[in-house]
Swiss-Prot record:
Protein name: Probable Fe(2+)-trafficking protein
Record family assignment: Belongs to the Fe(2+)-trafficking protein family.
HAMAP family from the UniProt entry: Fe_traffic_YggX
Organism: Psychrobacter arcticus (strain DSM 17307 / VKM B-2377 / 273-4)
Region (Disordered): 21-40
Amino acid sequence: MTATFNPQANTVFCRKYQQDLPKMPHPPFPNKKGQELQETVSEKAWKEWLEQQTMLINENHLSMLDPKAKQFLTEQRDKFLDNEDYERAQGWTPES
């Protein structure tokens, strides 16, 4: 039996962009939340979040050892991916 290519298996309905887009090749975390993100967030949206996260960590001097910093980033991630108002780095302006 020959495997058939299913393009739908390589896409997800992205919660940020509200359309089918290429999915992340692997869950971003090795847990249930990582699996959920892989099934609902496109690779494009995840890469954009990682850029935002890096700016927030750098600008706010966040330590990933601090549980409050981790909670803050989790909240901001969910807001970003759900198109809600999230905290942006001060020097950042969205592309028009």
